[in-house]
């Protein structure tokens, strides 16, 4: 046990140092490279502080949020294939953001910054609830049934987004397209502050529920006998995962597979104890998305690739390998 804790702590420290290095490196890269010495120049310092740093920190937040949501969903459904993108949760959030973009809604000035986030969280909460009800109704349902439900939800949300694209104007269509591919180019300090006000408390709340997630892996009856209010804790976890996915999608669009890939990789190194799995997954998700976004900004300069394309290129093959691996096991 002590050896396992030491190993997990080493992984946590290593990921923390890697994230710090990636933040410093990512903030210096782009069409205009900014060295440490250049920060003494006012023009370069303004670019670094108001353009580069908010984007880098937003990538950290979104990556951590998606990875943490993946840990919650895999623990909540006790299914290694559970992921915000595959189950349609991200699509539900994106659909509601599309509704906020295309259809006219009037919000008080104080709530304008929160408009898309409120819609995105509502969309993710609805989809999470539907998936949860499906799993509760068919407790003996297979992994394939869960994936088929996700495919159906993704298809419905995709069709609805297509309708919104059809009735929207040219500017709204462009905004929706960027949203569907995943993009962090709109990062600003106000956006970062709004996102962090949802994501950071949700990650901390998830960490506090790590013991509950460990007990839920034993099954609902066993967890109940050990003193867990299963229904209430599942509702809390469902709400937290909806907050994480909704807040992430509202500022970045759909970025897939981080919630699938990262928990699996971290579980291989730290084991299934959620007390280490949650914080290490959050750090690893932040590292992965930050690396992907840095590549997206530098591969085709001066243009930028949508970061969602890069994460899909990574996650797609991993997902196929995971399906083949589980088929061989069964």
Predicted regions and their residues:
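Alpha-helical transmembrane segments in inner-membrane proteins
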Residues: 1-330
